[in-house]
């Protein structure tokens, strides 16, 4: 089983990096996992809708170039489907049992995700209706993946 996380931007906060490294280490016995970062576009204040769409497109094209063919793609989006931790673990299990060998989770930048990526994804998933910093979403995703794999949620 391989899990790819494609995320926009670099993480500068040590506490988030420490948490990410903690969960990556805990996940390695269960699956092969990697995080790929794509460059985040600089977004000036007071963007027009056209400027916002252009930034999302550029980031989106970078993301698309990193997605491996044949991977089950899950985009993290606030308007996506909400599920609890148990259902998330069952979803991971069912996806791999259905023949997929790789899953790719996509985390957008500060402006969100390009619509084309959401349309091309197998699933748009929301962890909450609340807004979280995109850097923190990596840590939250890794923690949920660990819960799914460690046996407490029957994976």
UniProtKB/Swiss-Prot annotation:
Where in or outside the cell it occurs: the entry states: Cytoplasm
Q: Does the keyword Transferase apply?
A: yes
Annotated HAMAP family: 23SrRNA_methyltr_H
What does this chain do?
Specifically methylates the pseudouridine at position 1915 (m3Psi1915) in 23S rRNA.
UniProt family annotation: Belongs to the RNA methyltransferase RlmH family.
- Name recorded for this polypeptide: Ribosomal RNA large subunit methyltransferase H 2
Give GO terms: molecular function aspect only. Answer: rRNA (pseudouridine-N3-)-methyltransferase activity
Keywords in alphabetical order? Cytoplasm, Methyltransferase, rRNA processing, S-adenosyl-L-methionine, Transferase
What EC number(s) would the UniProt record show? 2.1.1.177
> Which residues participate in S-adenosyl-L-methionine binding?
76, 108, 127-132
Q: How does it assemble?
A: Homodimer.
> What are the annotated GO cellular component locations?
cytoplasm
Cite the Pfam families for this sequence.
Answer: SPOUT_MTase
Q: Is S-adenosyl-L-methionine a UniProt keyword of this protein? A: yes
- Catalyzed reaction equations: pseudouridine(1915) in 23S rRNA + S-adenosyl-L-methionine = N(3)-methylpseudouridine(1915) in 23S rRNA + S-adenosyl-L-homocysteine + H(+)
Broad class of the protein's primary localization: cytoplasm
Q: Which organism is it from?
A: Thermoanaerobacter sp. (strain X514)
């Amino acid at each position: 089983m391989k899990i790819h996380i494609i995320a926009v931007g670099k993480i500068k906060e040590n506490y988030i990096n420490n948490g990410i490294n903690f969960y990556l280490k805990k996940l390695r016995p269960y699956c092969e996992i990697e995080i790929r970062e794509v460059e985040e576009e600089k977004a000036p204040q007071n963007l027009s809708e056209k400027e916002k769409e252009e930034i999302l497109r550029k980031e989106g094209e970078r993301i698309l170039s990193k997605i491996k063919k044949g991977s089950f793609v899950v985009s993290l989006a606030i308007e996506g489907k909400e599920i609890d931790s148990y259902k998330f673990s069952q979803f991971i299990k069912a996806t791999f049992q259905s023949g997929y060998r790789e899953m790719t989770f996509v985390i957008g930048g500060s402006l969100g995700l390009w619509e084309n990526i959401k349309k091309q994804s197998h699933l748009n998933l929301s962890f909450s209706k609340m807004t979280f910093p995109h850097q923190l979403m990596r840590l939250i995703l890794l923690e949920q993946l660990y819960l799914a794999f460690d046996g407490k949620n029957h994976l």
